[in-house]
Curated annotation (Swiss-Prot):
The lineage of its organism: Bacteria, Pseudomonadati, Pseudomonadota, Acidithiobacillia, Acidithiobacillales. Gene3D superfamilies: 3.30.70.860, YajQ-like, domain 2. Nucleotide-binding protein. Transmembrane segments: none annotated. GO terms for molecular function: nucleotide binding. InterPro entries: DUF520 (IPR007551), UPF0234-like_C (IPR035571), UPF0234_N (IPR035570), YajQ-like_sf (IPR036183). It comes from Acidithiobacillus ferrooxidans (strain ATCC 23270 / DSM 14882 / CIP 104768 / NCIMB 8455). The keyword Translocase does not apply. This is Nucleotide-binding protein AFE_0977.
Length: 161
């Protein structure tokens, strides 16, 4: 029985590369001259620190442009609220969404059932396995899942016949 896996992954190396080029650009930009703005990644979070919200917004714009250039989907980025940090600075945390949550997997299974596809979905940890009777049915399911917005980037792996 043919099957494939639906996953949501982010290439952390590309995120690091985008982060480093953004930091390099911030150090050379005129509007950040003399600023103590900083940006760092800790596991699945990117922490931005700057003097005011305007600079935080500029940093997010620069980072998102670099991420898009590197092929990282911006749906994987969840922007947190601005909070006060030490020394009169502002802090903002960007979370990277990695893996399918159970709720999103259930929505995908419901989407496949409502679409009358001859494919069944089963949740396996942070991924979804979809199996069906024919390859054509699975390819139609992939096309439908790609066309629908679930709020996070989805990739299709492990296609088996």
């Amino acid at each position: 029985m043919p099957s494939f896996d639906v996953v949501s992954e982010v290439d952390m190396q590309e995120v690091d590369n985008a982060l480093h080029t953004t930091v390099k650009e911030i150090t050379t930009r005129y509007d950040f001259k003399g600023s103590k703005a900083s940006m760092e990644r800790k596991e699945k979070e990117i922490i931005l620190v700057a003097e005011d919200e305007y600079k935080l917004g500029q940093m997010i714009d620069l980072l998102s442009a670099r991420l898009v250039k590197r092929g990282v989907d911006l749906k994987a980025l969840e922007v947190g609220k601005v909070a006060a940090a030490a020394g009169g600075m502002e802090r903002q945390v960007l979370s990277l969404k990695v893996g399918l949550e159970t709720e999103v997997s259930k929505r995908m299974i419901k989407f496949l059932k409502d679409g009358k596809f001859k494919a069944q979905g089963s949740i396996q940890g942070d991924q979804l396995r979809v199996s069906g009777k024919s390859r054509d049915e699975l390819q139609a399911a992939i096309a439908a899942l790609r066309g629908h917005d679930f709020g996070l980037p989805v990739q299709f792996t492990n296609f088996r016949d």
